[in-house]
A protein has these predicted regions:
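Intrinsically disordered, low-complexity regulatory segments of kinases
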Residues: 1-181
């Protein structure tokens, strides 16, 4: 953080100039998954950043690849003979978590719906209330996307979203279902 200031009741924070988002890099690379060693390093940094937030009683609530930026998105280009195309490999996987516009302190009002749909935890979809674990769910979805190159839960419908979760993870716990009634 370089500086911060208040602008008509809005806290503004200035940071260093960053590179592309991890999503934009993935998209520009034809959704070619990141190599596992890069996934591991990016996942570690995201977990460390979120741990810092949670230790300070703050939930990000909108973690997604678009809100994770490379410090520098320079890349090396190589030609894949098998796929007959150029592929990019980011030179440095140093990242920063950004966009704290919907971040919420533990003691503040928690709106019913948070997170971008594809990274939304089941307790948010079921409107059971949420806290810091919703960030952890989002991290899991992000790591999957980095590793395979596509979104785990590609949907825009609550019921379909929950059905997709059940297909992958098994039935939603009955204690959660009971609380929705």
């Amino acid at each position: 953080m370089f500086d911060w200031f208040d602008y008509h009741g809005h806290m503004c924070i200035s940071f260093e100039l960053l590179g592309l988002s991890t999503f934009d890099f993935l998209k520009d690379n034809n959704y070619l998954p990141y190599p596992i060693h890069q996934v591991r390093h990016m996942a570690y940094q995201v977990c460390q950043a979120v741990k810092f937030l949670h230790d300070n009683k703050l939930t990000h609530t909108d973690l997604k690849p678009e809100n994770i930026l490379f410090v520098n998105s320079d890349y090396e280009l190589s030609y894949n003979l098998e796929k007959k195309r150029d592929e990019r490999s980011v030179k440095s996987t140093a990242i920063r978590v950004v966009d704290f516009g919907s971040a919420t302190f533990d003691h503040e009002h928690h709106s019913t719906i948070v997170s971008t749909r594809h990274y939304r935890a089941p307790e948010v979809i079921l409107e059971l209330g949420w806290s810091q674990p919703c960030d952890v769910w989002s991290i899991g979805c992000i790591i999957f996307e980095y590793y395979v190159g596509f979104t785990l839960f590609q949907t825009h419908d609550n019921r379909e979203h929950l059905a997709m979760m059940e297909r992958i993870l098994g039935p939603i716990p009955s204690r959660m279902i009971r609380k929705t009634r």
